[in-house]
């Protein structure tokens, strides 16, 4: 349910962009993201930091897009959000606390080196996506950028999440990955 709730603002943005324009879509994105935060809190009594950061960026850059009637701001929002996530993961690692471990470490037991590898992989992913967004936003037409933002980045994130899950599974203790500790493995 929560994952579906996370995609609703993006779907609304895409639909209204196709029906109207970037400015109507951006206004709807701001409103839908605000409603998403309220609904998330009502259902789960908690809102994650990533959601709050995303909302703040949507409100600031979306507001500037509408107020100044300049779609460059909403294009930059994507890059800045990914950059903030990459910087946040880097800073948390340097300070000795893996943000990803903080999110998943209660359910999953992994060696510190594996958490560090996952952290750096996501830093690389977010950095790559931030740069790719700038390229697509300024080298290709607005329609292409909207499709890239909605479908390309979503697909890339889902694929990277699955790859991360595979990496995690590979490094789980035998008890957590469904294998009995007395069953021989091919290691």
Curated annotation (Swiss-Prot):
Keyword ATP-binding appears in the UniProt entry: no
Keyword entries, A-Z: Cell inner membrane, Cell membrane, Membrane, Transmembrane, Transmembrane helix
Chain segments annotated as transmembrane: 25-45, 50-70, 76-96, 118-138, 148-168
Domain of life from the UniProt record: Bacteria
Localisation: Cell inner membrane
Topology within the bilayer: Multi-pass membrane protein
Major localization class: membrane
Pfam families: IspA (PF04279)
Cellular component, GO, one term: plasma membrane
Known function: Plays a role in cell envelope biogenesis, maintenance of cell envelope integrity and membrane homeostasis.
Family to which the UniProt record says this protein belongs: Belongs to the YciB family.
PANTHER family: INNER MEMBRANE-SPANNING PROTEIN YCIB, INTRACELLULAR SEPTATION PROTEIN A-RELATED
NCBIfam families reported for this sequence: ispZ, PRK00259.1-2, PRK00259.1-3
Stated name of the protein: Inner membrane-spanning protein YciB
Species of provenance: Vibrio vulnificus (strain CMCP6)
């Amino acid at each position: 349910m929560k994952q579906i709730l996370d995609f609703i603002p993006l779907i609304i943005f895409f639909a209204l962009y196709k029906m109207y324009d970037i400015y109507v879509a951006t206004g709807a994105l701001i409103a839908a993201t605000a409603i998403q935060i309220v609904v998330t809190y009502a259902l789960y009594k908690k809102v994650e930091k990533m959601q709050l950061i995303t909302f703040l960026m949507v409100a600031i850059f979306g507001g500037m897009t509408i107020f100044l009637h300049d779609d460059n701001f909403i294009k930059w929002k994507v890059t800045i959000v990914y950059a903030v996530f990459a910087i946040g993961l880097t800073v948390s690692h340097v300070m000795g606390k893996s943000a990803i471990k903080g999110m998943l470490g209660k359910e999953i037991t992994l060696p510190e080196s594996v958490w560090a590898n996952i952290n750096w992989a996501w830093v690389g992913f977010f950095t790559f996506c931030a740069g790719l967004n700038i390229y697509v936003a300024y080298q290709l037409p607005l329609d292409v950028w909207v499709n890239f933002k909605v479908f390309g980045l979503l697909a890339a994130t889902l694929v990277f999440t699955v790859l991360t899950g595979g990496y995690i599974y590979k490094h789980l203790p035998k008890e957590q990955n469904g294998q009995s500790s007395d069953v021989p493995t091919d290691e």
